[in-house]
Amino acid sequence: MNRLAVEIPGLSLKNPIMPASGCFGFGQEYSKYYDLNKLGAIMAKAVTPEPRLGNPTPRVAETASGMLNAIGLQNPGLEHVLAHELPFLEQFETPIIANVAGATEDDYVEVCSRIGESKAVKAIELNISCPNVKHGGIAFGTDPEVAHRLTKAVKSVASVPVYVKLSPNVADIVSIAQAIEAAGADGLTMINTLLGMRIDLKTRKPIIANGTGGLSGPAIKPVAIRMIHQVRSVSNIPIIGMGGVQTVDDVLEFLIAGADAVAVGTMNFTDPFICPKLITELPIRMDELGISSLQELKKERANQ
């Protein structure tokens, strides 16, 4: 038995580690560093129906223990992704989770109805929580009724399981999660970035041209752990956890809090080998802590 294996809807993972969407492109650049077959899965960059240029620059800023970004879902559009990006990923055994975004419900439905045409795509990550886009995005992810309606619409056309990415920029994440689960979502991914800002002392203006950006990195990990624990306490829905993962202990903390698998985001920018490193270190750390397998860890969590 593979002690690191994870089975969740649409995804048979050889290990629970994957790069988060927006931090790995469509994998081509990282494939020059290591074999992508080592990964549990790949969360690909967000896709919208039409190409998007994203927000004006500057749109990235460093912060203490993290970074701000306001990329604005820059991507080449659905047709290009289907024709040129996803075919590259089909050579690997690693399951692909396609991140889908949009400004309207029709945008999401259009992409979700077709993204499964790629044999590499085993699941969809519904990006209803991106805080950078002025029209759509944040609105879908902060209203339980709107999130429920969108999830239901996407589920009616998707050919693969649907995981919904939750925004932490809400007063009650549990009510959002419950509404999405009631709409038929196969799983959740959480959390997306927290809204933040930095000021340039010389210009007296925000460093990010868009004003605000999404805060990611180690600074948000305690928030992610808390929110995953909250949702897990009321639901057994599969969860892919993310938010500030740096170390193998972070991975285990997410799993113990209630995640079934873990995505690594910002650290890919500072260490392109972070995912394979964590995969190598995980069984060693499990031995040190007396954890026989992730399956046993899940059972232990359920009995608490």
Swiss-Prot record:
Its main location: cytoplasm. Keywords: Cytoplasm, Flavoprotein, FMN, NAD, Oxidoreductase, Pyrimidine biosynthesis. Binds 1 FMN per subunit. One of its GO terms (cellular component) is cytoplasm. Its cofactor is FMN. InterPro entries: Aldolase_TIM (IPR013785), DHO_dehydrogenase (IPR050074), DHOD_1B (IPR033888), Dihydroorotate_DH_1 (IPR024920), Dihydroorotate_DH_1_2 (IPR012135), Dihydroorotate_DH_cat (IPR005720), Dihydroorotate_DH_CS (IPR001295), Dihydroorotate_DH_I (IPR049622). It comes from the Bacteria. GO terms for molecular function: dihydroorotate dehydrogenase (NAD+) activity. FMN binds at S21, K45, A46, N99, N127, K165, I191, G217, G243, G244, G265, T266. It is found in: Cytoplasm. It is an enzyme of class 1 (oxidoreductase). GO terms for biological process: 'de novo' pyrimidine nucleobase biosynthetic process; 'de novo' UMP biosynthetic process. Heterotetramer of 2 PyrK and 2 PyrD type B subunits. Belongs to the dihydroorotate dehydrogenase family. Type 1 subfamily. Catalyzes the conversion of dihydroorotate to orotate with NAD(+) as electron acceptor. This is Dihydroorotate dehydrogenase B (NAD(+)), catalytic subunit. It comes from Listeria welshimeri serovar 6b (strain ATCC 35897 / DSM 20650 / CCUG 15529 / CIP 8149 / NCTC 11857 / SLCC 5334 / V8). The lineage of its organism: Bacteria, Bacillati, Bacillota, Bacilli, Bacillales. The gene is pyrD.
